[in-house]
Amino acid sequence: MAVTVETLEKLERKITLSLPLTAIQSEVDSRLKRLARTVKMDGFRPGKVPMNVVAQRYGYSVQYEVLNDKVGEAFAQAANEANLRVAGQPRITEKEGAPEGQVTFDAVFEVFPEVKIGDLSTADVEKISADVTDAAIDKTIDILRKQRRTFAQRAQGTPAEDGDRVTVDFEGKIDGETFSGGKAEDFQFLVGEGQMLKEFEDAVRGMKAGESKTFPLAFPEDYHGKDVAGKTADFLVTVKKIEAAHLPEVNEQLAKSLGIADGTVEGLRADIKKNLEREVKFRLLARNKQAVMEALVSKAELDLPNASVQAEIARLLEGARADLKQRGIKDADKAEIPEDVFRPQAERRVRLGLVVAELVRANNLHATPEQLKAHVDELAASYEKPEDVVRWYFGDRQRLAEVEAVVIENNVTAFVLDKAKVTEKAISFDELMGQG
């Protein structure tokens, strides 16, 4: 097999392959003979179809398969011998004017780039930290109490206030016509908790059971109901019942209902703190990991293989269509979505992936079995039966591969933080959790 390699662009290469026709024909004959043993054709007994008949019927398709296989094998061998790391699939075309007894192909493809990572000691990384405070524990307990609240009807004549559960009938009209979803009876919601539009809650707040009120309500431009978005409706609402919320006391009974073994408030707070600390750890790691990756990419020089970018765009496009389909959008799989919408994100992902892969290779940051086990144990710790979760992860290679990817990212994060110029910044628990 004759092979030549040519550089076309920064990452684009061309391999010219010449294969002897005798080798191709020999393989075609061999496959046709195997096919003749099993092929069934009218007028012939199984395995007794003459070779010339088999060749006439299947010769073209078998020759096509053999050419594909032989060229693919030759390309893989040539790329390997030339130490070329191929990115994506090659574009293979047959050349005219091949020497007698030969068939010649051009394979045009891209290679993965050389990744140059600069001096990480000059990289600036802001590393955040946060603590679980008593206030955070108190807030979590309040949330747990709200989840277990009960309601009792208020005395007649008592106005509705924030935290109350109200039962109402309402009807909204736009230009005198009731619209879809604009009418309901015995509808319940909690006042002041954002379950309804602010104007609706403001109108109901202060009303008493048995009272009715009319008021205008302007739907926001970005309202999810497209038929009413940006329009103003006239509402009639009647309050039928007002119920006050009663939160359980923070005591042994609450602790036991939440599964605290010793049934003490101290045990409850300790359990909440442990869970919050686990969540804080994961969120801090995610935030700091993002800062590290941005710093790492800023110190790297590389060209992006278009084949890898296009493949990533295709994945993002497929994900977007799947999301539209899940939302109930009709013909989501045929939706016209411009590829360029995803190009910046695809380029970032490909660039980061190549840089991380090079750092891992150059510094042996691969996940060890001990690290995998420790990470899975940590993930399983928050479940009722951790041992079942551990078995679930280790029982599937794909799930374990996802854990391995996370551990490698953690190794990269620790490596860069050890080398870079790190600025420590303490933030509040609420800021980390994205709470106001």
UniProtKB/Swiss-Prot annotation:
The gene is tig. GO terms for cellular component: cytoplasm. It catalyses: [protein]-peptidylproline (omega=180) = [protein]-peptidylproline (omega=0). Residues 163-248 form the PPIase FKBP-type domain. This is Trigger factor. Consists of 3 domains; the N-terminus binds the ribosome, the middle domain has PPIase activity, while the C-terminus has intrinsic chaperone activity on its own. It is found in: Cytoplasm. InterPro entries: PPIase_dom_sf, PPIase_FKBP_dom, Trig_fac, Trigger_fac_C, Trigger_fac_C_sf, Trigger_fac_ribosome-bd_bac, Trigger_fac_ribosome-bd_sf, Trigger_fact/SurA_dom_sf. Belongs to the FKBP-type PPIase family. Tig subfamily. SUPFAM superfamilies: FKBP-like (SSF54534), Triger factor/SurA peptide-binding domain-like (SSF109998), Trigger factor ribosome-binding domain (SSF102735). Keywords: Cell cycle, Cell division, Chaperone, Cytoplasm, Isomerase, Rotamase. HAMAP family: Trigger_factor_Tig.
